[in-house]
């Protein structure tokens, strides 16, 4: 594998939901709810976001997904949390059943969209914010900008604004920051090509389909797998994927770096996926994998340490999408957080 592919594998492995491990096609009666629009809320004239709220009670739990991922990635978690408190998931602009975005998919724009959505839907704080991967960056920025609205956070294998610098430091080739950023350009170019191809329509078996359409997570039941694949036929989805991927470690990282501060006494639980035990890739060495794992754990431990009530847990037998591979651990952390938020009143 070439250097560019190596970099892309490192970075994107921590952004999107994998399609592999875990119990497959879990039986969940509520699954079909995620396969169709629920409440389409207008956040600005002519643009709507899909919102799905179930359950009752305060604080309201808000779910934010990984990069360009739909709300359906929480199908094994949200219904169970809703037995304890109100729980709301949503599709970001262009993802799932939401309308296309009108601006870049940076964390600042995502936070602004989410706040508009909650206001229009009359969902009042306090909130327990739950973010997976890129969603972890988004909910952290929400807290930094609006701390009085947040009662607690659960960060599910969250991406981190400093992770690309960590990867650069692990590279044996001594790249400058500018050179390192440039290594991601071919991936962004591919996303642009997918936007163009989506406007024409994808045909299974073609090169464009292979490059642009990803399998649904294997844990999803067939009804959600079909919806996941149908989502990827939409030009709006590929535009969202392009703008979020272009923003996550550029504009979004800068926004987090500028805004970040102590969580003070805010309850925070950080969940980290288990160490990778799969065979080494052709670009990996045992030392590199060990260093990469240590860096990831250290970044997550730092997030927990930013709170006087922070907890960091490594979830056994999990992959990056812990909510799919080990949903029990995520449900338990959220319910624990809801209880802490209620006790703090």
Indicate residue ranges for each PLM-predicted region:
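N-terminal cap/lid segment of alpha/beta-hydrolase-fold proteins
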Residues: 28-48
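Conserved HGGG/HGGXW glycine-rich cap/lid loop of the alpha/beta-hydrolase fold
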Residues: 43-97, 145
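Active-site loop/oxyanion-hole signature of alpha/beta-hydrolase fold enzymes
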Residues: 52, 89-134, 146, 171-172
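Alpha/beta-hydrolase
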Residues: 63-64, 90-92, 156, 169-175, 180-302, ...
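Alpha/beta-hydrolase active-site loop signature
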Residues: 68, 92-96, 135, 160, ...
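Conserved hydrolase catalytic core segment
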Residues: 124-170
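Catalytic active-site module of serine/aspartate enzymes centered on a nucleophile-bearing elbow/loop
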Residues: 306-345
């Amino acid at each position: 594998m070439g250097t560019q592919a190596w970099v892309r594998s490192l970075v994107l492995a921590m952004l999107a939901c994998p399609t592999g491990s875990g119990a497959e096609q879990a039986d969940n009666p509520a699954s079909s709810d995620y396969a169709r629009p629920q409440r389409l809320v207008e956040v600005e004239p002519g643009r709507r976001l899909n919102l799905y709220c179930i359950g009752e009670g305060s604080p309201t739990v808000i779910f934010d997904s990984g990069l360009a991922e739909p709300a359906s990635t929480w199908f094994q978690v949200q219904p169970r949390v809703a037995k304890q408190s109100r729980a709301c998931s949503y599709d970001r602009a262009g993802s799932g059943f939401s309308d296309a975005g009108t601006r870049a998919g940076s964390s600042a724009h995502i936070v602004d969209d989410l706040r508009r959505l909650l206001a229009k839907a009359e969902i009042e704080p306090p909130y327990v914010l739950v973010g997976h991967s890129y969603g972890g960056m988004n909910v952290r920025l929400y807290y930094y900008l609006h701390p009085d609205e947040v009662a607690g956070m659960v960060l599910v294998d969250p991406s981190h604004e400093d992770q690309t610098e960590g990867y650069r430091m692990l590279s044996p080739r001594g790249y400058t920051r500018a050179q390192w950023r440039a290594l991601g350009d071919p991936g962004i170019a591919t996303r642009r090509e997918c936007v163009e191809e989506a406007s024409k329509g994808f045909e299974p078996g073609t090169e464009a389909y292979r490059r642009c359409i990803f399998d649904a997570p294997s844990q999803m039941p067939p009804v959600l797998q079909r919806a996941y694949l149908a989502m990827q036929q939409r030009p709006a989805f590929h535009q969202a994927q392009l703008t979020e991927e272009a923003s996550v470690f550029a504009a979004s990282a800068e926004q987090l770096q500028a805004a970040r501060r102590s969580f003070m006494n805010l309850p925070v639980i950080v969940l980290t996926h288990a160490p990778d035990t799969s065979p080494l890739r052709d670009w990996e060495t045992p030392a590199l994998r060990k260093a990469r794992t240590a860096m990831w754990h250290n970044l997550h431990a730092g997030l927990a340490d930013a709170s006087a009530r922070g907890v960091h847990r490594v979830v056994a037998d999990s992959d990056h999408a812990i909510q799919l591979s080990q949903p029990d651990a995520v449900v338990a952390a959220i319910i624990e957080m809801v209880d802490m938020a209620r006790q703090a009143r």
